[in-house]
UniProtKB/Swiss-Prot annotation:
Ranges in the topological domain labelled Cytoplasmic: 119-142, 194-200, 246-457, 501-526, 579-586
GO BP annotations listed: amelogenesis; calcium ion export across plasma membrane; calcium ion homeostasis; calcium ion import across plasma membrane; calcium ion transmembrane transport; cellular response to high light intensity; cone photoresponse recovery; detection of chemical stimulus involved in sensory perception of smell
Membrane topology of the entry: Multi-pass membrane protein
GO cellular component: apical plasma membrane; cone photoreceptor outer segment; cytoplasm; membrane; plasma membrane; vesicle
Protein name per Swiss-Prot or TrEMBL: Sodium/potassium/calcium exchanger 4
Pfam family, one: Na_Ca_ex
């Protein structure tokens, strides 16, 4: 999820400043997983022990996404993925006595390295590519910008298919998807500092397509194997999603134009019809509000663009005779020219009323002591023969809104030492990483390196692949040392580590008043994770590396997690709808509770608490 324009430098700078919060959150997730593994591990071991008598008939060796070679035999434990990586410098006993802390610090360092590469090098190069290809904002956001935020998950999935042959990659995809939907929305709702009005079209569009993608994924993994055409279908589905984003404006106009227009009485649908407690459909007829009840009107701030027709339809006042006359003259009983003039007059009056309300002025005193207001039906009449009176009746000119301060470009540099003491400590720890990246990757954000954006793209991609490999390696060692299965480490620790930077960026964007964009983009980026993050590795394995082969899937444990993912999407959209499409603290607490429930159920399923699902991981005394 990346933003263009002047907000991106501010977002990147703030993300660097929030490094302690990110590290603290990831460590808290790891501590929660360790406690849960100790709590549910014994229960799951008993369930697995009681099920050993049926293992030869019901169990195939747990090698998620591993190519079928016909030589697998039934075993009483699952081979750990740690053997697919280079040998660690420490033994298992040394790690259990404290050396694992070094691996945790290394994994956190890789999380930060991935965030730096994506924010300061990879995403700017993608923006330059989009500019050269003349892509629209929607298409660029659905393709290159989505790739910029989901590249760590994609490489984790590739490593899971071609190196570990385990479930750490798909666990990261599923866990990151749930984290993006629940945690990002929850954090924005709790800490945005304002109530964010969500656009129903963007949320419903991405949620419906994402639901379709998850259902297709469940159907494909149900038979415990992936063939070449199934990976191809996932990629084709993403191509269709790009087309939807390309024609997003036309589709939105088609689905929203269903309700009666104020101007001509033709069917037009307002976005406020779905999810607005003020709208009941009775105000489509201009004559209805004449005898209706005046509802409590929400307060509207002074915005650059005010949707006057939607505001009037959502909270119509009780009109008296002068305004009622204007409303009647915009019906189809009058000619088009009269309707246009009266509609323009209503819009001008309503705009003036909103400006006065925003400035705390609800009425204007006249010379004879009366007050002039739309609410009491006194519409001002201009007298061209008395310019002095017209000048006195005109409202004072409004001061122009202050222009936003320009955001200075904050280029990453190893030689800019911060002034604060805490920032200096962080600068010392991150200096080797920043120096290495600045020396090896040209920063195409700078004017002199702008023409080398393709070199930036290639080198940044290589560094992302290297950091992702080290990250998955360290997380695999941590999980093996603590006795946590790879899929749980992927769903929790890896998902949080790769998604917390995006969560912090979404919070920053929400505080800037763009919370709707942040929330809708989180769901849209999950479409990339499922369709591309899984479709591309599966397609490469079955069509390029080994044509005609299949990818083995442990659907017994994976289907449960994907069903939980599907349920979390449905419950989140339902909660947003019941909350009148508003993102506030109440909705934030609701989705965070859903995330905690998802983690608990996923961990209990993987530890065989409810029923036997997975074999325990093979342990070695080294």
């Amino acid at each position: 999820m990346a933003l263009r324009g002047t907000l991106r430098p501010l977002k990147v700078r703030r993300r660097r400043e929030m490094l302690p919060q990110q590290v603290g959150f990831v460590c808290a997730v790891l501590a929660l997983v360790c406690c849960a593994s100790g709590l549910f591990g014994s229960l799951g071991h008993k369930t697995a022990s009681a099920s050993k008598r049926v293992l030869p008939d019901t169990w195939r060796n747990r090698k998620l996404m591993a190519p079928v070679n016909g030589t697998q035999t039934a075993k009483n434990c699952t081979d750990p993925a740690i053997h697919e990586f280079p040998t660690d410098l420490f033994s298992n006993k040394e790690r259990q006595h404290g050396a694992v802390l070094l691996h945790i610090l290394g994994a956190l360092y890789m999380f930060y390295a991935l965030a730096i590469v994506c924010d300061d090098f990879f995403v700017p190069s993608l923006e330059k590519i989009c500019e050269r290809l003349h892509l629209s904002e929607d298409v660029a956001g659905a393709t290159f910008m989505a790739a910029g935020s989901s590249t760590p998950e994609l490489f984790a999935s590739v490593i899971g298919v071609f190196i570990t042959h385990g479930d750490v990659g798909v666990g990261t995809i599923v866990g990151s998807a749930v984290f993006n939907i629940l945690c990002i929305i929850g954090v924005c709702g709790l800490f945005a500092g304002q109530v964010v009005r969500l656009t129903w079209w963007a949320v419903c569009r991405d949620s419906v397509y994402y639901t379709i993608s998850v259902i297709v994924l469940i159907v494909f993994i149900y038979d415990e194997q992936i063939v070449w055409w199934e990976g191809l279908v996932l990629i084709i589905l993403y191509v269709f999603y790009i087309l939807i984003m390309k024609y997003n404006v036309k589709m939105q106009a088609f689905f929203t134009v269903k309700q009666k227009s104020i101007a001509n009485g033709n069917p037009v649908n307002s976005e406020l019809e779905a999810g607005n407690d003020f709208y009941d459909g009775s105000y489509d007829d201009p004559s209805v509000p004449l005898l209706g009840q005046v509802k409590e009107k929400p307060q509207y701030g002074k915005n650059p663009v005010v949707m006057v027709d939607e505001i009037m339809s959502s909270s119509p006042p009780k009109f008296t005779f002068p305004e009622a006359g204007l409303r009647i003259m915009i019906t189809n009983k009058f000619g088009p020219r009269t309707r246009l003039r009266m509609a323009s007059r209503i819009i001008i009056n309503e705009r003036q009323r909103l400006i006065n309300s925003a400035n705390g002025v609800s009425s204007k005193p006249l010379q004879n002591g009366r007050h002039e207001n739309i609410e009491n039906g006194n519409v001002p009449v201009e007298n061209p023969e008395d310019p002095q009176q017209n000048q006195e009746q005109q409202p004072p000119p409004q001061p122009p809104p202050p222009e936003p301060e320009p955001v200075e470009a904050d280029f990453l540099s190893p030689f800019s030492v911060p002034e604060a003491r805490g920032d200096k400590v962080k600068w010392v720890f991150t200096w080797p990483l920043i120096f290495l990246l600045c020396v090896t990757i040209p920063n195409c954000s700078k004017p002199r390196w702008e023409k080398f954006f393709m070199v930036t793209f290639i080198t940044a991609t290589l560094w992302i692949a290297v950091f992702s490999y080290i990250m998955v390696w360290l997380v695999t060692i941590i999980g093996y040392t603590l006795g946590i299965p790879d899929v749980i480490m992927g769903i929790t620790f890896l998902a949080a580590g790769t998604s917390v930077p995006d969560c912090m960026a979404s919070l920053i964007v929400a505080r800037q008043g763009l919370g709707d964009m942040a929330v809708s983009n989180t769901i849209g980026s999950n479409v990339f994770d499922i369709l591309v993050g899984l479709g591309v590795p599966w397609g490469l394995q079955t069509m390029v590396v080994n044509y005609g082969s299949t990818v083995k899937i442990n659907s017994r444990g994976l289907v449960y997690s994907v069903v939980l993912l599907l349920g979390s999407v449905a419950l989140t959209v339902l909660g947003i709808h019941l909350n009148k499409w508003r993102l506030d603290r109440k909705l934030g607490v609701y989705v965070l509770v859903l995330y905690a429930i998802f983690l608990c159920f996923s961990i209990m399923i993987e530890f065989n608490v409810f029923t036997f699902v997975n074999l325990p991981m093979c342990r070695e005394d080294d």
